[in-house]
Design a protein with these regions (language model features):
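Intrinsic, short, N-terminal disordered tails of RNA polymerase sigma-factor systems
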Residues: 1-208
């Protein structure tokens, strides 16, 4: 039987609520929204840039440029789902940012970003973005699932799953480390896996 859905903490704020708070005249919710926006989407941008061949430093620069660009446009930005998914809009922003950085590098040379597209731009570009997006969804799902068990005083259940499934420790090794029996490890694996799938599906439905 599936466990009860967690009460949505700040980490699970919907994209719509984040966009709404970004336009708030109150600095407190606006700053919170920017932090949530950064924590949610910066890893996607960084992962995509790295998959395109950027170094860590280059990828971080792409992130900063994209976030700053969105910040500048936010007062005028109105997201219309009828015009396409936000993930597509964000990918376009990232692509334009990387293109602009390459152009600036070719003119002045201070930023070595000409290697940002080592991978063939015609091959698997959309798939690279999808991989980065799915990675972000899974990361958030893991965080939310961990919070779910922690709030219920069952963090050990999640830790058993984490050691056994995410970190690759055997069931006996996990049991010994956490001071539980092997059967409890297997039970935790089943329950947390089910919960994780549930949370991930919710996030996928929300993000589109």
């Amino acid at each position: 039987m599936s466990e009860t859905h967690p009460t949505a903490p700040p980490a699970t704020s919907t994209r719509a609520s984040i966009f709404l708070k970004l336009k708030s005249t109150d600095p407190t919710p606006r700053e919170l929204a920017w932090r949530q926006f950064y924590e949610r989407y910066a890893p996607v941008v960084q992962s995509y840039a790295r998959r395109k061949g950027a170094s860590d430093q280059q990828a971080e620069e792409v992130v900063q440029n994209v976030i700053c660009g969105f910040f500048e446009a936010s007062p005028r930005f109105v997201y219309d789902p009828a015009r396409g998914r936000f993930r597509g809009y964000l990918k376009t922003c990232v692509g334009r940012t990387m293109g602009r950085m390459r152009h600036e590098s070719s003119r002045s040379g201070p930023i070595p970003v000409d290697e940002l597209e080592v991978a063939d731009a015609r091959a698997d570009d959309d798939e690279l973005w999808e991989q980065a997006w799915r990675q972000q969804i899974l990361r958030r799902a893991v965080e939310i699932t961990r919070e779910h068990y922690a709030r219920r005083g069952k963090l050990q259940t999640f830790l058993a799953f984490e050691h056994n499934v995410l970190l690759g420790a055997s069931a006996p090794e996990t049991a010994q480390k956490l001071g539980i029996n092997v059967a409890s490890v297997h039970t935790a694996k089943l329950r947390v896996t089910e919960k994780l799938k549930e949370v991930r599906q919710i996030l996928q439905d929300e993000e589109g």
